[in-house]
From Swiss-Prot:
Protein's name in the database: Small ribosomal subunit protein bS16
Gene: rpsP
Entry-linked InterPro entries: Ribosomal_bS16 (IPR000307), Ribosomal_bS16_CS (IPR020592), Ribosomal_bS16_dom_sf (IPR023803)
Region named Disordered: 114-156
Domain of life, source organism: Bacteria
Entry's Gene Ontology cellular component terms: cytoplasm; small ribosomal subunit
One GO term (biological process): translation
Protein keywords: Ribonucleoprotein, Ribosomal protein
GO MF terms held by the record: structural constituent of ribosome
Organism of origin: Rhodococcus erythropolis (strain PR4 / NBRC 100887)
Amino acid sequence: MAVKIKLTRLGKIRNAQYRVVIADSRTRRDGRAIETIGKYHPKEEPSLIDIDSERAQYWLSVGAQPTEPVEALLKITGDWQKFKGLPGTEGTLRVKEAKPTKLELFQAALAQAENEPVAEAITPKKKKAAKADEAKAEDTAADAEAPAADAEAADK
């Protein structure tokens, strides 16, 4: 029985995700697999490539033939070079940066809040309101002067 290492497709339309499987060469693409040894998500940035190196080495040693896409993945992870005895067994796999945990984000926010100066709870009045207050003050002053002028005129 000829055994191949190939990809089976999973996922939604336009969001392909693959599993790296060991299967009989005569089975269809998504057919029955002997063993699943990894996964490949090409749409993520950087692409997620997770292959069980020990199982891949075993299946390559017993004669399983990788398809062209799987061979390219094995070269990226360094498993193909290890099997062939070539230099560069560390591979060229890029790893996604780890996201900070919620606890780390919370601690950072607390530290930032402690370092900031305390702000006033009351916001200053807008400039338009200040101009309106000045206009009202002038009107009240003018109104106060008018009765005083009337009183002086009446006294004379």
